[in-house]
């Protein structure tokens, strides 16, 4: 396997061959440059706030300031919510959160994986796979025994060890979505 010298070469090669590459060596080269961490700067906070405001803040009639406050408080301390950034070297390219509440109609289940996001410029390069593969280990380190999520994606989260529980009425649009659970004590392998 050719030694790749920079992140753009790795990303481009992976993008060109993403359907056929099975090489662990290439994936390892990508992983050396990718990290998931909570060390977030003021610039990162601004970026994450913009992502979340554009994604759901506007649609749910939240002000930018309200989303900023939510994001700021999800970066502090060891309690939930907790926000994790996906970094390509030092560039923030994605994120996810562990929260106590994500679905208003189901306060009986928690904690949640929420706000899984990859910056549009970095989609289709395999970074989402890396991000989702990190969830279980990160949750274990945070002391979480299980996680829940709801989504319209069918077949995606199963690849990362999530178990489909049932279809649920979210009272959102779309109303019917899929509820999943991840046992952080079970073995995780992406397919």
Predicted segments, located by residue:
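N-terminal amphipathic/hydrophobic targeting modules at extreme N-termini
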Residues: 4-5, 10-13
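Helix-loop element at the rim of GNAT/NAT acetyltransferase active sites that forms part
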Residues: 42, 49-63
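Conserved active-site alpha-helix within GNAT-family acetyltransferase domains
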Residues: 141-145, 151-175
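Conserved beta-strand in the GNAT
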Residues: 83-85, 91-101, 112, 117
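Conserved acetyl-CoA pyrophosphate-binding loop and the N-cap/start of the following alpha-helix
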Residues: 122, 126-134
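Active-site rim helix/loop that mediates acceptor-substrate recognition in acyltransferases
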Residues: 57-84
């Amino acid at each position: 396997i050719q030694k790749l010298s920079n992140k753009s070469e790795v990303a481009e090669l992976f993008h060109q061959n993403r359907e056929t590459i099975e090489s662990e060596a290439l994936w390892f080269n990508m992983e050396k440059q990718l990290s998931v961490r909570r060390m977030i700067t003021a610039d990162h906070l601004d970026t994450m706030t913009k992502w979340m405001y554009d994604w759901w803040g506007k649609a749910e009639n939240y002000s930018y300031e309200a989303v900023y406050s939510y994001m700021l408080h999800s970066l502090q301390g060891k309690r939930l919510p907790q926000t994790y950034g996906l970094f390509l070297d030092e560039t923030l390219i994605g994120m996810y959160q562990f929260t106590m509440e994500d679905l208003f109609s189901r306060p009986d289940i928690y904690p949640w994986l929420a706000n899984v996001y990859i910056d549009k410029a970095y989609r289709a390069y395999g970074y989402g796979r890396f991000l989702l593969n990190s969830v279980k280990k990160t949750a274990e380190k945070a002391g979480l025994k299980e996680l829940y999520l709801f989504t319209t994606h069918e077949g995606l989260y199963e690849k990362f060890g999530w178990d489909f529980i049932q279809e649920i009425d979210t009272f959102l649009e779309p109303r019917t979505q899929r509820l999943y659970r991840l046992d952080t004590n079970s073995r995780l392998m992406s397919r």
